[in-house]
Amino acid sequence: MKELWSPQNRYQKWLEIEILACEAWAELGKIPASAVETIKKKASFDLQRIAEIEEVTKHDVIAFLSCVAESVGDEGKFLHMGLTSYDVVDTALSLLMRDALEIILEALEKLLKLLQEKALAYKDTVMIGRTHGVHAEPITLGLKFALWYCELQRARQRLERAKEVISVGRLSGAVGTYAHIDPYVEAYVCRKLGLKPAKISTQVLQRDRHAEYLNALAVTAASLEKFAVEIRHLQRTEVLEVEESFAQGQKGSSAMPHKRNPITCERLTGLARVVRGNALAALENIALWHERDISHSSVERIIIPDSTTLLHYMIVKFTEILQGLQVYPARMEKNLQLTKGLIFSQRLLLALVEKGLLREEAYALVQRLALQAWPEGDFRDLVKGDPEIGSYLSAAEIDALFDYRPYLENVDYIFWKAGLSDPPVAKWEQKARVRLVSPKRSGEKRELVYEGKAKKVYKTSDPDLYLVEFKDQATAFDGMKKEEIPGKGRLNNLISAYLFALLECAGVATHFVSLVSETEMLVRAVEVLPLEVIVRNLVAGSMAKRLGMPEGRELSRPLVSFCYKSDQLHDPLLTEEEIIALELVTPDQLTALKEISLKCNQVLRTYFQSKGILLVDFKLEFGFDHQGELLLVDEISPDTCRLWDLETGEKLDKDRFRRDLGDLISGYQKVWQRMQGGEG
């Protein structure tokens, strides 16, 4: 970073821009090609000579140009043709700011990787969570690291956005009108430098870009400060749950030999204040006079190199802090006991409400004992000795409330949402099974509103609910191949219901309400979108045929594509641009469809793999209910998924029927049996 912001590198960027501008003029026939070759061969500069000239001119760009012209000779007259100083200075500054962010982002990637490792390492290390500085309820140290990981992912997105915003150049003259320069010169130079030409400018690029950049740096620095402050609090003598490493020979105080202070975290806290202050200065730079004044220049010469250098330093130092961080689980356990059971007060409150007390009554009862426990003794003992609570809860029920484990049941789910682990499908399976055997909701089957190849849909007595009946008919090739296969409807209904319930545990909204029978389910009424979403993990089916590739080739990442639902047109593929142009969905809805589909893929792929099944690809359908909520609809079954045995590669899906690979039901039955815990 120091080299990046050196005068040598800055002037080198200026020279590069001047030479590229000459090349562009030569292509336009305004400068002899031989002159450009001479300039490229001879052009150089000397820092001391530039400083000498600037002493006289009081203008750094003129001093630079004079120095370069001296090295070139007569051909130096073509340098800076049609340009103004900030055509060069601003474009070069954009390059430097872009390159600085690349250095910062590289360091940030290392920190993110380390945070991921720390989060997983301490995922189950229980400690007390604190609100307002006061003990609240149990969490884990890994959750803190996971929180920081997600926050820095957002920081990375902001910094990437800032890099995009600042990766812009301008060579448009004194007031941005190209009065003495051809726009081609700007386009040529920017293309060679990997920048985009500004859509419009004055004598300078507009400073909202630089302000956004500095604010992205400041927010990132503030996040690092937040993490450092947390470590400082956790290192306080009264807490001492973590500690900065303390090197051999290091001293903490000139007067007190025992001191081990969190000095690096304190340093980061202070530096973040500097970066924040610089961001404010960048905001002040936005309001320039007319087509430009120079008030921003002196500010930027300080705040931009300083802020990028400081943030890079902060990231590197915080990475070192994490690498050497001392963690004390025994102290965490001791601190959990400090409040003598008060941290379980909410569990007691909810248990009393479940037993029939009004919430306000239960709250007052628990609070009375909690306030008594602070000065007097053990909260659990007070609870057990209270006759009113004893009339609702037994001693065993009370003891069960004073347990850390329920607070941590969803840590795996949080880690999955944070992108730190696979979805915890094993924990969701029991919930999904409960959904399948929960009390059936029913609506009187009334008018048949739709019959397709695989299902019938009926209105019910409730206008917001439909009843879906799964048929035994199997079809392929747009109905050219048909067969009644007893038991197919039952298996597709049960498998779909189970997978809908599983996905709902992962936060995916579906139309599924409940099973009505082994071949029927109750669903929410929706307006179905005319799109099918296809998610592929491996090359297979139509993709293999279209590309002439063998089936089974794994894709480097899941591929999402879309089809227009039309039997007559054989469900043609649609590009995302076509979907938006045809207004089939809005851009935001399209983004949501992709995100939900990829989420489904992550859950289903992990789930099926745990059952010895490979999820090759699958199709999904979506719709909106009357409240405008986007729901996953239709079915998720071997009819709509390609499912292969993980070890043998045996196809367990509808391809058995399409390609005459064996009995359809036996394949579907294997899938259902494995989902139920059998070998299949």
Walk through the language-model features, giving the residues of each.
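Glycine-rich cofactor/substrate-binding loops
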Residues: M1-K13, I53-K58, D74, M256-L436
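A long amphipathic alpha-helix within ATP-dependent nucleotide-binding catalytic cores
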Residues: V585-V616
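Conserved metal-phosphate-binding beta-hairpin within the catalytic cores
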Residues: V535, L615-D634
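C-terminal helix-cap and adjacent tail motif
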Residues: R553, I636-G680
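A short glycine-rich, hydrophobically flanked beta-strand micro-motif that places a catalytic Asp/Glu
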Residues: V513-T519, F608-G623
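Active-site loop/lid in soluble adenylation, ligation, and acyl-transfer enzymes
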Residues: V437-P439, K445-Y564, R674-M675, E679
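A helix-coil-helix interface module used to build multimeric assemblies
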Residues: M1-S172, Y178, D182-Y188, P197, ...
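Glycine-rich anion/phosphate-binding loop at the beta-strand->alpha-helix junction
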Residues: A155, L159, Q203-H296, R301
